[in-house]
Amino acid sequence: MEGGCGSQWKAAGLLFCVMVFASAERPVFTNHFLVELHKDGEEEARQVAAEHGFGVRKLPFAEGLYHFYHNGLAKAKRRRSLHHKRQLERDPRIKMALQQEGFDRKKRGYRDINEIDINMNDPLFTKQWYLFNTGQADGTPGLDLNVAEAWELGYTGKGVTIGIMDDGIDYLHPDLAYNYNSDASYDFSSNDPYPYPRYTDDWFNSHGTRCAGEVSAAASNNICGVGVAYNSKVAGIRMLDQPFMTDIIEASSISHMPQLIDIYSASWGPTDNGKTVDGPRELTLQAMADGVNKGRGGKGSIYVWASGDGGSYDDCNCDGYASSMWTISINSAINDGRTALYDESCSSTLASTFSNGRKRNPEAGVATTDLYGNCTLRHSGTSAAAPEAAGVFALALEANVDLTWRDMQHLTVLTSKRNQLHDEVHQWRRNGVGLEFNHLFGYGVLDAGAMVKMAKDWKTVPERFHCVGGSVQNPEKIPPTGKLVLTLQTNACEGKENFVRYLEHVQAVITVNATRRGDLNINMTSPMGTKSILLSRRPRDDDSKVGFDKWPFMTTHTWGEDARGTWTLELGFVGSAPQKGLLKEWTLMLHGTQSAPYIDQVVRDYQSKLAMSKKQELEEELDEAVERSLQSILRKN
């Protein structure tokens, strides 16, 4: 079972980890309340809510917890509604009533690079270079998602539903209507089953409709373009369009219809301003954990997240959604393989797809559906990248409905390719087991053809275990110049039930303060020599009070490695002015399997990463068997 990390929070009999946030800003209170009843039951909850003038929804991921909302209250204000809170607390049937605080969540659609209106009279399929790159808009031929191979094999996303968690979907759009799944859709901003975008003169709420078209736009209907998984179904989950986000709305959206929705696509997150450190709150963490444990009949909901649009001034490891083990974080490249100007780099990004963010050529953007039956060529940002990945994953799920959420991450690592991607800052490197990765692009660009072929024969990976590899609790000063270097020796819980031999995710849970948080640089090196940049410089972050409080920095760069040995943590400052800092805690969290995940997989391509990894696993198994035999002989003698 998956749990969180950080401080613990108990609800509905389950123990979860909570990311701790602190802010100097005054809180904003919303018209949403988290309510727990002494006697559980939806009829009881409806009666209690009605008596107090509230609407009500049951939270699907927790027993006895309900979402009460009051349309007569202001959606956002600086003071608590003490009258309504006390009214609820005085009711003997109510055990707890907590008014929800509001916080910012931003869509990850980069500003338009070119505002020229494009004539949309003709279908846009030939302009969808991310599907078939023949060199359109001065792109690099062949640099695409390789969907052609998947389609030729007969995989188009049939039987798979993707939920777009966003500002709504124009489900009346002729290119989306046929594939729209109304049963799996809901509007959490207005509390009704019709997630249609709210009208604005500037079409601000076109974000979700554009993302939906990338995934599920119908094929061969002479309208706009074609979705990556054009026979998949798309569900609209409207949840972004209100003055402030709340934990209860995020949690409800992430846990909506987990037996109907297979993949959740999120192109939003905390503000990408280069100085925010934020992530999911208690209820949302619980909903995510519930999703990967129970969604899709126990195979786990698949959460796809845009890595962020903060550019070189930000680091996506400061985003608790993109850096979560339970999400697949996706970055973007432009059509010639270069990085987009808005791309954030971090060690938690798993792979990349495509968007625009450098070129002014009007056809270099992502072609997709737009509001009110229109089409656009101007979709961009990592907002465009995440839905493309969701579409590729839908093709893989059609090829093998038994894939778990972890299987999808393994397939992503094994089938993504460097192709012709080019990062001007970070070199491509190989980790301790030979897997090639990049600090910005992850393990490379998704390859739909390779993924569906491997998915067809895929055997579910072994059980996952969690090990606290060790902890440094003594405060250590970070010098103004040079680095603080700490080491941890771990056996990865060998000899115990939770022994982790083959790594998936690694977290460094860190508490640290600095006179200027943005100048802090943190690196961690594994026993097999793989260096992960956990935190890079963020020049706009001038925080000197909050720091990081039990923040789980995550890396995927040590995937497949042996965790046993010495881990090294390096902390220092990068900047023109001298700074001071204090590391209060470093806890090493190891997540992975005891048995080799690829040793029983079918290899079709003997040049593939799977073939290389399986060969290495077989050699390691043989070496360990020989070692055990020698030790047995020595003991007998």
From Swiss-Prot:
It holds the Pfam family P_proprotein. Glycans are attached at residues 374, 513, 523. PROSITE patterns: P_HOMO_B, SUBTILASE, SUBTILASE_ASP, SUBTILASE_HIS, SUBTILASE_SER. Its main location: cytoplasm. CDD domains: Peptidases_S8_Protein_convertases_Kexins_Furin-like. It catalyses: Release of protein hormones and neuropeptides from their precursors, generally by hydrolysis of -Lys-Arg-|- bonds. Residues 25-108 form a propeptide. Residues 1-24 form the signal peptide. Residues 128-452 form the Peptidase S8 domain. Serine endopeptidase which is involved in the processing of hormone and other protein precursors at sites comprised of pairs of basic amino acid residues. Responsible for the release of glucagon from proglucagon in pancreatic A cells. The gene is Pcsk2. GO terms for cellular component: dendrite; extracellular space; membrane; neuron projection; neuronal cell body; perikaryon; secretory granule; secretory granule lumen. Belongs to the peptidase S8 family. Furin subfamily. Residues 460-596 form the P/Homo B domain. This is Neuroendocrine convertase 2. It is found in: Cytoplasmic vesicle, Secretory vesicle; Secreted. Keywords: Cleavage on pair of basic residues, Cytoplasmic vesicle, Disulfide bond, Glycoprotein, Hydrolase, Protease, Secreted, Serine protease, Signal, Zymogen. One of its GO terms (biological process) is nervous system development. InterPro entries: Galactose-bd-like_sf, Kexin/furin, P_dom, Peptidase_S8/S53_dom, Peptidase_S8/S53_dom_sf, Peptidase_S8_Asp-AS, Peptidase_S8_His-AS, Peptidase_S8_Ser-AS. Transmembrane segments: none annotated. GO terms for molecular function: endopeptidase activity; serine-type endopeptidase activity. Gene3D superfamilies: Galactose-binding domain-like (2.60.120.260), Peptidase S8, pro-domain (3.30.70.850), Peptidase S8/S53 domain (3.40.50.200).
